[in-house]
C-alpha cells in the first residue's frame, strides 16, 4: 500500500498543497517553519482519526476557515482509491471514499494504516498518562474497527456526566421547579452509559496491550541487547474489568463510594479517561529509572511493535512516517530505524537539513519549492476570482445602463 498523491486545503499552514509520492522512501526536506510536519501529520489524521500533536480538531484548520480537507489517492494491490476527510473547526468531521456518500470520519479510520515516529515519542515513556492514552487510542483505532466510534461515544457521555456533577457541585443551571432530583436522575442515566462504554474501552485497550506485549519485549531485546527485559503493564482506572467476570455492578458500587468526592470536585474521578500504560525495564518503571537512551529505544520498540501487529492483523504494511527523528537519534539508533524503514512499502521522512537525508535511493521533495508553488497557485486563484468579480460588476453596470 502507498499514497500516490496527497492534496491539502486549509490544513494548518497550508492554504492549498498538492504533492506526489512514490513507493519506497520519500523525503520532505526543508527548513523549520515551512510546514513539512503538517504534511505528514495530515496522513496520520487520515489514518488514525487523530494527531499526536493535539487532541482537538481546531488547530488542524487554517485560521479563518471553517474546515480543512485532506485527500489521498491510495494504491493497494493494483487498485486505486481516493480517501477524503473534512476536518471541521467546530462540529463533526466527515469522510468520503471515491467521491461516495458522506460518512463520519471515524468510519474510515484504519483503512489507510500508518505508524508515526516523532521527536515526542520519548514522552511515551517519560511523559504524562495522557500521552500514553493517546497512543493506546490510535493503536486501538487501527486494530479494532469499532473502537473509534466507542471512544467518541464515551467522550460525549463523559462530558455530559461531568456537566451534571458540576451542576451538583456549584448549583449552577439547576431548574428551580424540578431541582436537584432531576439532576440526580439524569446523572444515574449518564452513569449507566459511562460504565457500559467504559468497560468496553477498557477491554479493548487490554486486548491491544496483549497484542503489543510480546513483540515489544522481543524488539526491545533485539535493539538493546538480549539481557534487557522490557514489558508493558496496563493500569486501568476500571481495574474491576480485569478482576471480575461481570464488572459493571462492582464499578457501580465504586461510583457510589466516591459520589461525595465527585460532587465536591465536579468531575469524573474514575474511568478510561484516567487510564495509564506503564513501560517497565528490568521490572522497574522506566520513566523513573531508565536513561534517555533507553527511553528512546523503548519508544522505538513500541512503535515497531505496533507496526508489526497492525501489519499482521490487517495483512498490509502500514505507511511509515519518520518526522524529524534523525536529528534526535544517535548513529546507532538512526541505523536501526533506517534498516527498519527500508523494508517497508512506503516511508515518509521529514528532515530540516540536507545533511540529514539518509543515504540510498529516495524520492526527495523540496518543501520550499512546494511552498512557493502553493503560494503562486493561491495568487492565480485570487487573481481569477478578482477578474470574475470585475466581470460580473461590469456586466451589472451594462444592464443598468440599458435599462
Curated annotation (Swiss-Prot):
Main location: cytoplasm
Gene3D superfamilies in alphabetical order: P-loop containing nucleotide triphosphate hydrolases, RecF/RecN/SMC, N-terminal domain
GO terms classed as biological process: DNA replication; DNA synthesis involved in DNA repair; double-strand break repair; SOS response
Coiled-coil positions: none
Lineage: superkingdom: Bacteria
Organism (species): Bifidobacterium adolescentis (strain ATCC 15703 / DSM 20083 / NCTC 11814 / E194a)
Function in brief: The RecF protein is involved in DNA metabolism; it is required for DNA replication and normal SOS inducibility. RecF binds preferentially to single-stranded, linear DNA. It also seems to bind ATP.
Record carries keyword Nucleotide-binding: yes
SUPFAM superfamilies reported for this sequence: P-loop containing nucleoside triphosphate hydrolases
Record-level Gene Ontology MF annotations: ATP binding; single-stranded DNA binding
Location of the protein in the cell: Cytoplasm
Annotated protein name in UniProt: DNA replication and repair protein RecF
Keywords attached to this entry: ATP-binding, Cytoplasm, DNA damage, DNA repair, DNA replication, DNA-binding, Nucleotide-binding, SOS response
UniProt binding sites for ATP: 30-37
